[in-house]
């Protein structure tokens, strides 16, 4: 009984496509990351605010390199993003005029399936729903889903689903299972149909309906062609609803490729071609099977077929035989080139529409592999395996080539008339950006005229841009032409003019078009990166270590209390994109200063203008009234204090570059009382201090200018201010009698005046919370009011009954929006939403509307803070309003997924020195710029930032350390765009959010340290706090010159040699993350594993020491046996380099053992005597380290093929061995005598990539993952009658992870703040969690559950699966079951004893948080959560405790417990408690 939860989203980009999906956003980019679909748009920003190098975790060296590339292109680029469509005529003269294109996330959807392809499908011209295009998705096991954008729901909507995995379609009985064949999705460029190639040679055709071409052609001329015929409306009724099912597609059908042509027995690749009237497909195939093709040459065939969708028939129009056998891809080329480009490992061949071929050989090996006629460009020495090709400039015949090592090349076609006469390749020089791509590319998608998205599975995906350099003559000519240009034209006009210049009139010849294009767009290309998507894929290996700083340094002293106990370190990426990813759950702030400030209860930093002398004040007001201070440093800090006796005061401090100092001699009165809020108004001419009993206004020198008392003139009451919100020129106060006070500052007198509350609702309603918001994005704009007015300030109020009111200031006559259902927390909030009677309400304590984002893009969000500090986020969106439609009918709020639960308040002793502090309400703080983020901070016992970047959704990240009771932004010369806060321990810190880490992309802190060579493994050495990284660099393979049997090898002189790996060990300092030592292995020696082992180093004293063990393989060809080697290194102290104290460590070789047969593939500790378990070839051997530097074998176990992992349950001698082809072996090791015994085995037909233990109290489970993405739960139980006395392992269940198959794992202890009933562990056995890592970048946990918790959560998951709509029409339950095609051929891993127990899917449980309170209550009751009772002691994440520690939240002395009704409240707390354990990083808080 376990629960599988994915902690991070996949980051490896597998597919991408550009389309017009969302109306009004131009071109969108759809990105597939295995099971995550993301939709982006682009935004052009000035290079002055280009922050991808600072907000996306690039290190110092990479930022310097990026700066170098950036500077080099400034001399050639005027406007960056669109220079090429201006013909390259604009040559940059100033750096501040350069622009960059940025990606902005529009939507993301997690799919219960693995995407294998994306395709753009254009909608018919008459379609009115959504955008101009639909998106077609293909999935494993031959499934298609057609989706479109739903404007009203602001999300993707499924149009149709298509399944083709029927048994009769798979083929012959001897054909391999369906999942072993890759699926290929291709679409016709004119969107007439799409094709899905699945199984061995099946082709599913999905036709799309097309309008009558003669009727719907844009060039219909009524004078020549007569009146346009009327469309047949017989299928429609009066209200517009059709009686005929209106679908954009026709019934699909499946064709066997052999029916197209009998010789299509072994298809390789296919693509739809351009410029054909009917759908036309080009198929590359082989006449021989791959196994029978060795020794044969030129047996590939390229054929072109025209498809008749009505008759379901085809016609062969072209066939080219005798093609090289290393071709692997067909690339369809648009006009004017046309035809198809066949890509091979050693050549490129173009086939035009008439069958004429032109090709080039790109390396010397081509002559030996083919007799096909090719132009020789062998001096390029290119390897085209894994390359990517896309259009760069079609009118110039230029295509971009990206090799598998990331190098850029330019393919140019020579066009004579209407035919292609040849092609050539030119590599881009590194100084022109030819090496900006670091990894192999999986997808290319053209975004604009000079930008292209480059997706990768092995590193960061980037948005690549290019410009063209020109000579002085062309520059001079460009300037002359610029004088005649109309500079008022917009981009679309210029683009249209460009097209007119390129193609001219309809009668213009291709030669004229080409010459015009060359005249406009000549010059060398320069490439640079505009933006990037963070990736931690693939995760090769994981370890954990302690954060470390220089001993006795100021940083070490300052970081005390705000550093995590451990950090997760992963070896990620491949090739030049390899890196170490350092991950922490919470933000680790960069401490600028630290001091004790126990009385601080609130911070507010302000920057105000100096008052102007009266002699300089004109008739129209002060001369500096329009001066913007937003970029100025903060000058003053107001601090609210509470001393030990509970006396409340406020002080003001002057901020300096060195810190801050107390300010005296002003009219600021500390004894006036406790400050509730502070800020500036009157365009920063007045400093506002909101006290509990009054509001004070000061000028820029803190001279008192006005006092506004809180006095009700009618009743004489003096209500006290509870919360306040400032949005110049308005002030909103929420008082303890639930009334509101609204004031406006006059622009001339700069004095506050109360705004008359004309609406009776404002005076008769009790208000719980509220805020002011300045709308800068236009989401809340009133179309009837012009921009630039003060009407963009809105007031949001929440009544005690849970109703949301929105007023547009200064109009207080009536609200512009009323939503009565806010307290029900619905998935979508509108003015018309209504809940059923008796539905439970949430206790909402605070609302805040704030902009979230970064310097690239920010957007408003409505943030609800619940009584237990949980947060709910809503994103507002508008529908296009019709004439006369009220504002409330066009505004909607969409709930944003957030599975982060607040921490429990710390338990305090009853005789606490300050009983008032537990009762004090700490409102959320809006921060406009903290390290470039527009963010919101949540103070209290669960201090958190809500962070968002342009490329991510909002994420709630906690701040490392204890609770926070005061916080403010802090922008000074010594701490730019930082913040100051005081924790509950009385420590105040001036800090910054580190800019070398990423946060919002994965929901945790990620810092990438580039390694530059392929990283295989990483290990942490605790005594020295250093990391050893096992890498493999590539080098040319040299034949042994001293071989006595092959003396001709010494005379080898070939230049194009194969590349092989050579192992390198790198020692990294945990302080500076720099390489301080390097050890190279022998040629052809590859590092396979690196582990830190506690070994016995002395046979006489039995001394133990932490040493680094390395396993390698020597592979010198298939005709020589593979040998292995075991190294044991110590990390010794040496004299450091001057100025580099971290270089005081070096790797020292202690032992080295050659293994004559087989590679050393895995290492582990074993037993209690300091021995090591070595997986060497087909044996697993226990070895001990001798003092003479040898490794003595003491016990062994024979294995079958190839051992992928060995694990020992620490200190028990229980070992687990996984074979790549023969399953899992469970063994035991004894030390007296030395012996290894086989306890049990799994099935011998299971391909195991990784295996590990998962203890659960007195039960011990074995977790094995195979190549198909299945996680198998096995158990050793000799008492079970079917286990043959334990010789066969019991199979408990199998769970499908899709593309996220675990390849690495860590068994970690689970540490909960309070005991949990979810883990079935006795007191003497601590709970454990298995952390899993996959090649897609997904980190996941597998944790055991107790019986009663498993039953409830499993029932809840079933209800969510059956009761919620699922994206793309997929089935989450079927997704987690073993693949149908895989299970048909898969033997059970062990004796079936699962008795129907499946692993609970945490991804489904996360969707429980999407529901409103009514649906939550209903589902929780059905799942067995008892209404009205306690939470059965479930409180692992502190759930079930209200803020303030007293069972409820106190605001101004009022207890808010049960304010909104608590039907089912305890029930929700019980569900929340159990979800808080199984979702997220619960139990792993030490990271």
UniProtKB/Swiss-Prot annotation:
The keyword DNA-binding is annotated on this UniProt entry? no
Any one GO MF annotation of this record: RNA binding
Domain of life, per lineage: Eukaryota
Q: Which InterPro entries does the UniProt record give?
A: Beta-prop_RSE1/DDB1/CPSF1_1st (IPR018846), Cleavage/polyA-sp_fac_asu_C (IPR004871), RSE1/DDB1/CFT1/CPSF1 (IPR050358), WD40/YVTN_repeat-like_dom_sf (IPR015943)
Alphabetized UniProt keyword annotations: mRNA processing, Nucleus, RNA-binding
Instruction: Provide ranges: composition bias, Acidic residues.
Output: 486-504
- Which terms in the GO cellular component ontology are assigned? mRNA cleavage and polyadenylation specificity factor complex; nucleus
**Cellular compartment(s):** Nucleus
Among the GO biological process terms of this entry, one is: mRNA processing
Residue ranges annotated as coiled coil are none
- Give the residue ranges for region: Disordered: 486-513
Family named by the database record = Belongs to the CFT1 family.
Function field = RNA-binding component of the cleavage and polyadenylation factor (CPF) complex, which plays a key role in polyadenylation-dependent pre-mRNA 3'-end formation and cooperates with cleavage factors including the CFIA complex and hrp1/CFIB. Involved in poly(A) site recognition. May be involved in coupling transcription termination and mRNA 3'-end formation.
Q: State the name under which the record lists this protein.
A: Protein cft1
What organism does this protein naturally occur in?
Neurospora crassa (strain ATCC 24698 / 74-OR23-1A / CBS 708.71 / DSM 1257 / FGSC 987)
Biological classification of the source: Eukaryota, Fungi, Dikarya, Ascomycota, Pezizomycotina
Gene designation per UniProt:
paa-3
């Amino acid at each position: 009984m376990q629960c599988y939860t994915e902690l991070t989203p996949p980051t490896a980009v597998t597919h991408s496509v550009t389309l017009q999906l969302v109306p009004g956003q131009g071109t969108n980019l759809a990105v597939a990351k295995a099971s995550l679909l993301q939709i982006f748009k682009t935004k052009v920003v000035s290079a002055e605010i280009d922050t991808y190098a600072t907000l996306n975790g690039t290190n110092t060296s990479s930022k310097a390199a990026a700066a170098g590339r950036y500077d080099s292109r400034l001399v050639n680029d005027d406007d960056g993003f669109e220079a090429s469509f201006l013909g390259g005529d604009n040559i940059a003269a100033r750096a501040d005029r350069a622009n960059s294109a940025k990606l902005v996330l529009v939507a993301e959807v997690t799919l219960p399936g693995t995407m294998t392809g994306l395709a753009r499908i254009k909608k018919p011209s008459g379609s009115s729903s959504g955008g101009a295009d639909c998106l077609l998705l293909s999935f494993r096991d031959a499934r298609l889903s057609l989706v479109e954008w739903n404007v009203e729901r602001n999300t993707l909507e499924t149009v149709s689903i298509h399944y083709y995995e029927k048994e009769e379609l798979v083929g012959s009985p001897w054909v391999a299972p369906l999942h072993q064949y890759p699926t290929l999705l291709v679409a016709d460029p004119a969107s007439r149909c799409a094709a899905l190639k699945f199984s061995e040679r099946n082709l599913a055709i999905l036709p799309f309906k097309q309008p009558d071409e003669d009727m719907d052609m844009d060039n219909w001329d009524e004078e020549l062609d007569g009146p346009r015929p009327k469309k047949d409306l017989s299928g429609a009724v009066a209200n517009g609803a059709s009686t005929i099912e209106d679908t954009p597609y026709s019934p699909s059908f499946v064709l066997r490729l052999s029916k197209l042509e009998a010789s299509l027995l072994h298809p390789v690749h296919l693509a739809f071609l351009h410029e054909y009237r009917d759908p036309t497909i080009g198929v590359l195939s082989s006449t021989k099977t791959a196994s029978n093709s060795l020794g044969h040459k030129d047996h590939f065939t390229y054929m072109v077929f025209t498809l008749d969708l009505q008759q379901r028939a085809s016609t062969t129009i072209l066939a080219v035989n005798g093609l090289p056998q290393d071709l692997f891809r067909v690339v369809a080329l648009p006009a004017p080139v046309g035809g198809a480009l066949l890509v091979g490992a050693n050549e490129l061949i173009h086939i035009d529409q008439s069958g004429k071929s032109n090709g080039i050989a790109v390396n010397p090996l081509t002559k030996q592999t083919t007799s096909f006629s090719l132009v020789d460009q062998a001096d390029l020495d290119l390897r085209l395996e894994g390359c990517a090709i896309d259009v760069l400039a079609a009118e110039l015949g230029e295509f971009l080539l990206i090799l598998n090592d990331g190098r850029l090349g330019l393919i140019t076609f020579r066009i004579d008339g209407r035919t292609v006469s040849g092609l050539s390749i030119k590599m881009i020089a590194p100084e022109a950006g030819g090496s900006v791509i670091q990894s192999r590319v999986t997808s290319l998608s053209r975004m604009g005229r000079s930008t292209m998205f480059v997706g990768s599975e092995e590193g960061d995906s980037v948005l690549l841009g290019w410009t063209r350099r020109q000579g002085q003559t062309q520059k001079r000519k460009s300037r002359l032409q610029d004088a005649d240009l109309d500079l008022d034209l917009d981009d679309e006009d210029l683009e249209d003019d460009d097209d007119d210049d390129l193609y001219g009139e309809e009668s213009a010849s291709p030669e004229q078009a080409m010459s015009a294009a060359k005249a406009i767009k000549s010059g060398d290309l320069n490439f640079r990166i505009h933006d990037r998507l963070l990736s931690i894929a693939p995760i090769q290996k994981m370890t954990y270590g302690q954060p470390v700083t220089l001993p006795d340094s100021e940083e070490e002293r300052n970081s005390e209390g705000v550093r995590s106990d451990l950090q997760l370190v992963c070896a990620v990426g491949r090739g030049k994109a390899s890196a170490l990813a350092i991950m922490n759950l919470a933000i680790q702030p960069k401490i600028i200063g630290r001091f004790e400030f126990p009385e601080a209860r609130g911070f507010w930093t302000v920057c105000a203008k100096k008052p102007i002398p009266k002699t300089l004040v004109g008739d129209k007001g002060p001369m500096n009234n329009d001066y913007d201070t937003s970029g100025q440093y903060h000058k003053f800090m107001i601090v609210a204090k509470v001393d030990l006796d509970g006396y409340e005061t406020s002080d003001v401090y002057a901020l300096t570059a060195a810190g801050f100092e107390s300010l005296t001699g002003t009219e600021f009165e500390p004894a006036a009382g406790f400050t509730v809020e502070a800020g500036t108004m009157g365009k920063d001419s007045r400093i506002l201090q909101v006290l509990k009993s009054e509001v004070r206004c000061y000028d820029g020198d803190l001279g008192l200018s006005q006092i506004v008392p809180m006095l009700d003139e009618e009743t004489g009451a003096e209500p006290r201010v509870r919360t306040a919100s400032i949005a110049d020129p308005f002030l909103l106060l929420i008082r303890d009698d639930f009334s509101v006070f609204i004031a406006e500052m006059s622009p001339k007198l700069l004095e506050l005046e109360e705004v008359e509350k004309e609406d009776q609702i404002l005076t008769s309603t009790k208000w719980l919370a509220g805020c002011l918001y300045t709308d800068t994005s236009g989401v809340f704009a009133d179309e009837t009011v012009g921009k630039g007015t003060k009407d963009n300030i809105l007031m949001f109020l929440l009544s005690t009954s849970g109703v949301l009111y929105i007023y547009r200031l200064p109009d207080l006559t009536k609200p512009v929006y009323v939503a009565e259902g806010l307290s029900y927390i619905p998935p979508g909030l509108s003015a018309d939403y209504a809940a059923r009677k008796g539905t439970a309400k949430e206790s909402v304590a605070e609302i805040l509307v704030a902009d979230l984002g970064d310097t690239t893009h920010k957007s408003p969000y409505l943030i609800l803070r619940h009584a237990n500090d949980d947060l709910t986020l809503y994103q507002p969106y508008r529908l296009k309003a019709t004439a006369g439609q009220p504002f409330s009918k066009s505004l909607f709020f969409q709930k944003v997924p957030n599975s982060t639960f607040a921490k429990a308040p710390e338990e305090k002793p009853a005789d606490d020195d300050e009983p008032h502090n537990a009762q004090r309400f700490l409102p959320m703080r809006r921060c406009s710029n903290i390290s470039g983020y527009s963010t919101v901070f949540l103070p209290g016992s669960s201090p958190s930032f809500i962070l968002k970047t342009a490329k991510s959704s909002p994420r709630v990240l906690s701040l490392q350390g204890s609770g926070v009771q005061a916080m403010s932004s802090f922008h000074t010369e010594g701490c730019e765009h930082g913040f100051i806060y005081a924790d509950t321990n009385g420590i105040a810190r001036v800090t910054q959010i580190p800019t070398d880490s990423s946060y919002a992309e994965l929901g945790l802190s990620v810092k990438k340290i580039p390694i530059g060579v392929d990283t295989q493994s990483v290990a942490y050495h605790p005594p020295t706090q250093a990391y050893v990284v096992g890498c493999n660099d590539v080098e040319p393979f040299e034949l042994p010159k001293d071989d006595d049997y092959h003396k001709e090898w010494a005379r080898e002189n070939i230049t194009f040699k194969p590349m092989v790996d050579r192992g390198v060990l790198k020692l990294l300092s945990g302080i500076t993350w720099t390489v301080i030592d390097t050890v190279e292995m022998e040629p052809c020696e590859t590092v396979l594993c690196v582990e830190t082992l506690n070994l016995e180093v002395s046979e006489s004293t039995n001394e133990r020491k932490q040493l680094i063990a390395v396993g390698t393989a020597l592979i010198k060809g298939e005709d020589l046996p593979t040998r292995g080697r075991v190294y044991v290194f110590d990390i010794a102290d040496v004299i450091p380099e001057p100025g580099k104290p971290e270089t005081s460590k070096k790797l020292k070789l202690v032992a080295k053992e050659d293994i004559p047969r087989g590679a050393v593939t895995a290492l582990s500790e074993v037993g209690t005597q300091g021995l090591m378990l070595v997986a060497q070839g087909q044996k697993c051997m226990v070895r001990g380290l001798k003092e003479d530097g040898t490794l003595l074998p003491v016990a062994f176990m024979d294995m079958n093929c190839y051992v992928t992992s060995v694990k020992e349950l620490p200190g028990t001698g229980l070992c687990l061995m996984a074979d790549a082809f023969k399953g899992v072996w469970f063994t035991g090791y004894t030390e007296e005598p030395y012996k290894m015994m086989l306890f049990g085995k799994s099935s011998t037909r299971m391909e195991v990539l990784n295996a590990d233990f998962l203890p659960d109290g007195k039960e011990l489970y074995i977790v094995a993952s195979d190549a198909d993405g299945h996680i198998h739960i096995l158990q050793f139980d000799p008492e079970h009658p079917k286990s043959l006395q334990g010789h066969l392992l019991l199979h408990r269940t199998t769970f499908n992870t899709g593309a996220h198959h675990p390849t690495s794992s860590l068994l970690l202890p689970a540490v909960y703040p309070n005991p949990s009933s979810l883990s079935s562990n006795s007191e003497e056995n601590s709970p454990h969690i298995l952390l899993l890592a996959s090649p897609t970048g997904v980190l996941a946990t597998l944790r055991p559950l107790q019986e009663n918790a498993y039953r409830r959560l499993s029932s809840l998951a079933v209800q969510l699966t059956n009761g919620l709509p699922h994206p793309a029409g997929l089935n989450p339950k079927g997704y987690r079951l073993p693949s149908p095609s895989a299970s048909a051929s898969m033997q059970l891993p062990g004796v079936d004893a699962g008795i129907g127990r499946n692993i609970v899917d945490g991804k489904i449980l996360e969707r429980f948080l999407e529901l409103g309170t009514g649906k939550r209550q209903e589902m929780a009751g059905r799942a067995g959560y008892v209404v009205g009772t306690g939470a059965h002691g479930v409180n692992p994440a502190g759930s079930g405790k209200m803020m303030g520690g007293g069972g409820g939240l106190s605001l101004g002395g009022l207890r808010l417990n049960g304010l909104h009704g608590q039907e089912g409240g305890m029930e929700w707390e019980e569900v929340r408690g159990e979800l808080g354990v199984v979702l997220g990083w619960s139990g792993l808080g030490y990271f």
